[in-house]
Amino acid sequence: MYDYNEYKALIEEHLLDYIPRIDAKAQTLFESMKYSLTSGGKRLRPVLLLAACDFAGGNIYEALPFACAIEYIHTYSLIHDDLPAMDNDDLRRGNPTNHKVFGEDIAILGGDALLNAAMELMFRDFTYQFDNPEKLRRHCRAGLIIAKAAGVNGMIAGQ
C-alpha cells in the first residue's frame, strides 16, 4: 500500500469510532473533543505508524487503534498548548482554538478526555490475544512506549 493519502483517509474514516460513548450530561465535552479532532491536520503521526506497520508486514487494521490513539494524544497536546496559561493562541489550523469555542474549563477537560481515551483505546479489547502471548506482549509494549512518550519524561516535559 504505502500511500499517504490512503493511510490518511483510513484514519479520517475511523478517528471518531474509538471515542468512548458519552452520556447526555457530557455532550459538551464530546463536542469539544470532536471539534479539535476534526479540525484538519496532516495526520502525520498516525500515517507514519500505519506506514511503518505496513512496511514491516503488519496488519494496518490491527494498528489502526494505536494510530488513532496517537492522534488523540497529539490533539490533546494542541488543546492544552493553546490555553491561556501556555501559549494563549486564538487560532489553530485557521479555526478558533478549543478554549475560545468551549471555554477554558471544557478545553482542559476535553484535552484530558482525549489523553485518557487514547490510553483506554490502546489497552481495551485485547483479551482475545491471550491465546497468543507474544502478540499480547507486543501489544502491551507498544501501548507502554506510547504512554511513556506522552508522559512526564516525554511530551509533557517538553512543553
Model-assigned labels for residue ranges:
Residues 1-4:
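Double-stranded RNA-binding/processing signature
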Residues 6-10, 16-159:
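Mg2+-dependent prenyl diphosphate-binding active-site environment of isoprenoid biosynthetic enzymes
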